[in-house]
Amino acid sequence: MTFQVIFQVEGTPVPKGRPRFARRGKFVSTYSPKTTVDYESKVSDAAKLAMGSQKPLEGPIVACIYITLPIPASYSKKRLKACLSGEERPIKRSDIDNFCKAIFDGMNGIVFEDDSQVVSLHATKVYGTVGMVEIMVQEHLL
């Protein structure tokens, strides 16, 4: 029997931001943007709750990520209807891989030891009335 964990992260998904650089004299340090750090923490909290006392998975992993972005308030009723029916998809805002990076970084050490264990990934980005992410992670069957 394979272990499987399914959980949701409520709120508008945040893509992984580019690292920032700060110069302190001769030294340059890098840091992640606050929005990225906060979102990764939110994912970590949801993952900890879903995992309970289960240890992080150690073998190959399969992940499915369903990203729901809120429909922009500026959209017309016609466009809103198209978004909710799936006719229009979010193609303007952020690459899907940047959302996945932030989600995987939030799950590191909790759901799995390291995101390099992910051997199969299915990610979908859609519009919805509220923003959220649904995540399913399971051991890969050989």
Name each model-derived stretch.
Residues M1-L142:
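Acidic, proline/glycine-enriched N-terminal capping motif
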